[in-house]
């Protein structure tokens, strides 16, 4: 039987019921709000917060990129700890591996440890007006002078050697000096090249990366190709970089945690034309290297708030090479440096010549001297540029280099035809019966181009290039039809831009503090900031790859090859005989005669000008005995006779070195 209730009790019960429903509804709404609450969102697709990520894998070290820096980092990690768990992700497919390292000129600069300060003087002069922090500068220059034995030991098990890039043994004094007029350019060094000892070649295309790839695989490296690192993963609270997101070949994405650190060895941004537009001001700047180097690492660093540096400089350090871009390749060929026939010229947008096009600018990484400064060759400012030639020049040789540039150095290289006929058939080269017709086909004013060719031919007849001083020996009349044109574009083999790092390889924020967990190596964030000395980028990649791993693992691998290591003495390949050199004493010159037998220095004597020396006979005998006994120029000077000792060792470089510029 129902209980009778009063109106007051009814209202009280109803109110309590409504309150309960309200509380229940609020709970449901709050739960729904929690479900719909936005996840931690970073500012860019290039960085995700770890709070939103479920890890699929975990490794000690994550190496992003498998060029020179990536291979060096893996090798160093293995040599520190054979059980290290290091995973390597690379964006390219295996057939096109190697990054900018395989497309480069394949040179590595080494410095005699006994001449480190002279090398530093030269490096400072190249950097000006930019200043590299002293700690960074001293670290890098010292590495260039001390790590040759480590590199030799790395390559030894896979039968690769470090030789002179021009052929023969690596000897002190055999090198290319790009800026011989700068202070310190007389440093004692050597330009190295890595090559298969049994390959029979003095120069191996891609040899430097080939050697390090083999050395890394020998030590167990298993690079995962077609695995593109698409983002960094960072703790939203602590800001530590904890891992990466990786896009696999099938399109799926995995997240990999790094227990000790993430290494960005992804190269520069040569393959991203828009980044060149924004950072370097060029409307069309092409990539001469790997098509997979598209600035991904730089974009990740920017998304993190890393401190950028060397995005641009007084010059484009590696230089605007003259590229030839064709539809069949994403990156460019490099125009032939040494033309056998002189019936050619380059013209700018208006159909006129704009500089001495035949000079060997590649020896200064496409710089020339103007008003007391080295500046970039002006190809980027004169677009569109075309090379104009006659039939004699066209048939004389390939129009492109066969040893630098991605299309000719990758693992499946293109072989340009000897007479350019195949490329003409492909439509890569423009042909016309007359200069006027050629001008119309390439978008130049016919009358202007005709006048420029006539002017060029008249200067050939006169025996002088009155406009730009081109060596008349490199010029011939452009008169034998048909005529040809090929477009040239500014092309970059490398760039230095990226986030600043310290000598430990740690990427820095704008306060100069390390971003925990993130490291970089190689071209991305390079220390190179203005003029570029041949062999620097590849060597820096090796040094910085090692430094980052040393920091992560808290160790350092010290390796020595079985043969002792180092570079040979300058006289190591000299023929038997006497070599006479006039050297400069404190005030006046004197003659020094060096005797070589069986590739060894066996005698040093003084010829003319003995009276101009300050050292006495006893000091001379002591010093020369040290040189002969040690077969090493690094012996200490005799007290009281420093200037004469330096003159004698300097004479060795004059007598036996092979410096080019």
Region annotations inferred by a language model:
Residues 1-18:
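N-terminal secretory signal peptides and thylakoid transit peptides that target proteins
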Residues 53-69:
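Beta1/beta-strand and adjacent pyrophosphate-binding region of the FAD-binding site
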Residues 80-101:
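Glycine-rich FAD pyrophosphate-binding loop
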Residues 142-252, 273-274, 321-322, 460-480:
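Conserved redox-cofactor binding core of oxidoreductases
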Residues 231, 448-528, 605-609:
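A glycine-rich dinucleotide-binding beta-alpha-beta segment and adjacent secondary-structure elements
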Residues 298-300, 307-441:
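An anion/pyrophosphate-binding glycine-rich loop and adjacent beta-alpha core
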Residues 568-661:
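Active-site- and interface-proximal helix/loop "cap" or "latch" segments in soluble metabolic
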């Amino acid at each position: 039987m129902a209980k009778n209730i009063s109106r007051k009790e009814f209202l009280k019960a109803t109110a309590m019921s409504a309150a309960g429903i309200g509380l229940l509804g609020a709970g449901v709404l709050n739960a729904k709000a929690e479900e719909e609450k936005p996840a931690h969102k970073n500012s860019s697709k290039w960085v995700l917060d770890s709070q939103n990520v479920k890890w699929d894998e975990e490794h000690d070290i994550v190496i992003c990129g498998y060029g020179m820096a990536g291979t060096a980092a893996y090798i160093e990690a293995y040599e520190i700890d054979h059980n290290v768990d290091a995973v390597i992700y690379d964006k390219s497919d295996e057939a096109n591996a190697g990054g900018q390292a395989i497309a480069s000129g394949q040179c590595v600069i080494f410095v005699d440890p006994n001449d480190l300060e002279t090398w530093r003087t030269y490096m400072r002069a190249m950097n000006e007006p930019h200043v590299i922090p002293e700690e960074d500068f001293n670290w890098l220059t010292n590495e260039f002078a001390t790590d040759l034995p480590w590199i030799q030991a790395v390559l030894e098990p896979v039968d690769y050697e470090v030789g002179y890039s021009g052929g023969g043994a690596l000897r002190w004094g055999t090198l290319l000096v790009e800026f011989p007029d700068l202070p310190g350019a007389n440093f004692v060094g050597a330009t190295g090249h890595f090559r298969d000892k049994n390959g029979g070649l003095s120069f191996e295309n891609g040899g430097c990366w080939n050697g390090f790839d083999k050395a890394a695989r020998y030590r167990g490296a298993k690079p995962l190709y077609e695995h593109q690192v698409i983002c960094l993963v960072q703790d939203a609270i602590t800001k530590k970089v904890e891992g990466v997101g990786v896009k696999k070949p099938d399109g799926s994405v995995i997240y990999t945690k790094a227990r000790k650190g993430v290494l960005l060895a992804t190269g520069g941004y040569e393959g991203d034309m828009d980044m060149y537009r924004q950072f370097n001001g060029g409307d069309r700047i092409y990539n001469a290297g790997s098509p997979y180097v598209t600035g991904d690492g730089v974009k990740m660093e920017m998304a993190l708030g890393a401190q950028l540096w060397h995005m641009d400089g007084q010059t484009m350090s590696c230089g605007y090479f003259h590229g030839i871009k064709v539809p069949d390749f994403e990156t460019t060929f490099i125009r032939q440096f040494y033309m056998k026939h002189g019936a050619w010229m380059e013209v700018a947008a208006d159909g006129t010549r704009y500089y001495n096009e035949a000079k060997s600018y590649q020896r200064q990484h496409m710089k020339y001297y103007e008003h007391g400064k080295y500046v970039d060759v002006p190809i980027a400012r004169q677009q569109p540029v075309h090379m104009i030639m006659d039939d004699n020049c066209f048939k004389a040789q390939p129009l492109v280099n066969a040893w630098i540039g991605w299309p000719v150095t990758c693992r499946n290289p293109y072989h340009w035809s000897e007479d350019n006929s195949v490329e003409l058939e492909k439509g890569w080269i423009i042909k016309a019966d007359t200069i006027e017709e050629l001008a119309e086909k390439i978008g130049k004013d016919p009358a202007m181009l005709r006048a420029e060719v006539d002017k060029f031919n008249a200067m050939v007849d006169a025996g002088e290039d009155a406009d730009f001083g081109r060596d008349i020996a490199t010029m011939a009349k452009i008169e034998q039809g048909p005529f040809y044109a090929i477009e040239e574009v500014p092309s970059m083999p490398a760039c230095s831009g990226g986030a600043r790092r310290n000598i430990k390889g740690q990427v820095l924020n704008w306060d100069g503090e390390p971003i925990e967990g993130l490291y970089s190596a190689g071209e991305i964030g390079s220390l190179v900031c203005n003029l570029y000395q041949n062999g620097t980028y590849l060597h820096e990649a090796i040094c910085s790859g090692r430094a980052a791993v040393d920091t992560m693992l808290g160790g350092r691998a010290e390796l020595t090859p079985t043969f002792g290591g180092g570079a040979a003495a300058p006289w190591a390949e000299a023929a038997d005989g006497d070599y006479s050199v006039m050297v400069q004493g404190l005030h006046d010159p004197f003659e020094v005669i060096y005797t070589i037998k069986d590739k060894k220095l066996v005698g040093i004597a003084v010829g003319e000008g003995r009276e101009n020396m300050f050292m006495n006979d006893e000091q001379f005998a002591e010093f020369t005995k040290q040189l002969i006994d040690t077969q090493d120029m690094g012996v200490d000077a005799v007290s009281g006779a420093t200037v004469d000792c330096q003159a004698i060792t300097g004479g060795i470089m004059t007598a036996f070195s092979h410096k080019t510029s």
